[in-house]
Amino acid sequence: MRKPIAAANWKMNGDFSLLDDFAQANITSDKCETIFALPSVLLDRAQKLGLNALAGQDVSAQVKGAFTGEISASMLKMLGCQYCIIGHSERRQYHHEDEALLIEKWRRLKEAEITPIYCIGELQAEYDAHATQQALERQLRPILEENLVDHKTIIAYEPVWAIGTGKAATPDYAQHVHQMIRQIVAQNYASIAPAMRLLYGGSVKPDNAGLLICQADIDGFLIGGASLDVGLFTKIIETMK
């Protein structure tokens, strides 16, 4: 059975005060796993506060060296990270990250025994052109062919047209795409695909989380804006019970 995940992606938001609020709220559930993908400057404090589980929002493709501003997989491990997001649409858009780079990032995470949360999703133009499957295969195939996927791997589907727009995918459409992702993975990893956890990310809120989590191939959420509010995040988790 796939245990649901509620992953909070704070992006470039948050401070010590908000972190303390979440720690005091003691958001835990035996029905789902909570993951906090925090700005790197907050990870040390989060670890000391006992906030679990922790994730990086990105990682360097390099092991170490003269790469100003980068954070290595070993540094994330030192800060208590069990997970790390790679391939988020904002990294793809603003930093022009492609699959070749993401493969190297994945390798660094694997070497540090950190589980990747690999983000994929179609652009508005691809959605309008009914080219979602082609977009997902383009983002998945290079990874699948590198023999990097294992039973711990998490894939997050984030329709780019839904992120930060308030326009969430319908439950039926989200399920259709998640099923498609599982089928694509199964072509290379037939024994792993049924147990792989697939997350939905894209304007997740308490009022749509319940219908989304009921879908057969949706195993949780990668939550943006709503994860910055203790009350909203808690309500989303409650829908997963």
Swiss-Prot record:
It holds the Pfam family TIM. It is an enzyme of class 5 (isomerase). GO terms for cellular component: cytosol. The active site is at 88 (electrophile), 158 (proton acceptor). One of its GO terms (molecular function) is triose-phosphate isomerase activity. Its EC number is 5.3.1.1. Its main location: cytoplasm. Transmembrane segments: none annotated. InterPro entries: Aldolase_TIM, TIM_sf, TrioseP_Isoase_bac/euk, Triosephosphate_isomerase, Triosephosphate_isomerase_AS. It catalyses: D-glyceraldehyde 3-phosphate = dihydroxyacetone phosphate. Keywords: Cytoplasm, Gluconeogenesis, Glycolysis, Isomerase. One of its GO terms (biological process) is glycolytic process. Pathway: Carbohydrate biosynthesis; gluconeogenesis; Carbohydrate degradation; glycolysis; D-glyceraldehyde 3-phosphate from glycerone phosphate: step 1/1. It is found in: Cytoplasm. Substrate binds at residues 9-11, 164, 203, 224-225. The keyword Endoplasmic reticulum does not apply. Belongs to the triosephosphate isomerase family. NCBIfam families: tim. Homodimer. Involved in the gluconeogenesis. Catalyzes stereospecifically the conversion of dihydroxyacetone phosphate (DHAP) to D-glyceraldehyde-3-phosphate (G3P). This is Triosephosphate isomerase. It comes from Dichelobacter nodosus (strain VCS1703A). The lineage of its organism: Bacteria, Pseudomonadati, Pseudomonadota, Gammaproteobacteria, Cardiobacteriales.
